[in-house]
C-alpha cells in the first residue's frame, strides 16, 4: 500500500518497525534497514540492478530475510520540487514492489542525500573510488533516517 503521509505510514505498521530504506538508481539501489524500534537507520547494501523482475525478486527476498514489512523510497524530485521523468519510473517500480511483496511504502523527497552521503564519506577520508561503493547505501540510510526523525519529532514513534 502506498501511504501518502508519515502518519498513515507509521499507523499501518505494527510494533515491530523494521523498515527498508531504498535509494533508487538506474544502475543500482542503495539499501538501508532500521532497527526493530524504527529509530535508527543503518546502511545495508548496494544492489546492482539487472531487470525489473530480478530486482523485485531480490528486494522481496531481502524483505523476507530481514523481516521487513515497510519501505521508505527516495523520490528524486527536481531542485524546484517538481516531479520529473525519474519520479514516474520510481512510482511505477514502487507499485510493482507493493503488488509483489505487499509492503507499505512511503515516498520521501531525496534531494541532496547523495551529496550529503558523498560529504560523509569524504570526511571519513575515503577515496573517491571507495566512496562510490558506499554512497548509495549511505544515501538510503539518510533517506530512511530523515523519515524516522520526522516521525519522532511529530510524536508518531
Curated annotation (Swiss-Prot):
Keywords: Cytoplasm, Hydrolase, Nuclease, Ribosome biogenesis. The keyword Amino-acid biosynthesis does not apply. It comes from the Bacteria. GO terms for molecular function: nuclease activity. Pfam families: RuvX. InterPro entries: RNaseH-like_sf, YqgF, YqgF/RNaseH-like_dom, YqgF/RNaseH-like_dom_sf. It is found in: Cytoplasm. GO terms for cellular component: cytosol. One of its GO terms (biological process) is rRNA 5'-end processing. Its EC number is 3.1.-.-. Belongs to the YqgF nuclease family. Could be a nuclease involved in processing of the 5'-end of pre-16S rRNA. This is Putative pre-16S rRNA nuclease. It comes from Anaplasma marginale (strain St. Maries).
Amino acid at each position: 500500500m502506498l501511504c501518502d503521509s508519515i502518519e498513515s505510514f507509521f499507523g499501518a505498521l505494527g510494533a515491530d518497525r523494521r523498515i527498508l530504506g531504498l535509494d533508487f538508481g538506474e544502475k543500482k539501489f542503495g539499501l538501508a534497514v532500521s532497527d526493530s524500534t524504527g529509530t535508527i537507520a543503518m546502511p545495508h547494501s548496494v544492489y546492482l540492478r539487472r531487470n525489473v523482475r530480478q530486482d523485485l525478486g531480490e528486494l522481496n527476498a531481502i524483505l523476507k530475510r530481514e523481516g521487513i514489512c515497510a519501505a521508505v523510497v527516495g523520490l528524486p524530485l527536481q531542485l524546484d520540487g517538481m516531479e520529473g521523468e525519474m519520479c514516474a519510473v520510481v512510482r511505477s517500480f514502487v507499485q510493482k514492489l507493493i503488488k509483489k511483496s505487499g509492503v507499505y511504502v512511503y515516498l520521501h523527497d531525496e534531494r541532496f542525500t547523495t551529496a550529503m552521503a558523498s560529504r560523509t564519506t569524504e570526511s571519513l577520508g575515503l577515496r573517491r573510488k571507495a566512496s562510490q561503493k558506499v554512497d548509495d547505501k549511505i544515501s538510503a540510510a539518510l533517506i530512511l533516517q530523515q523519515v524516522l526523525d520526522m516521525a519522532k519529532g511529530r510524536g508518531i514513534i
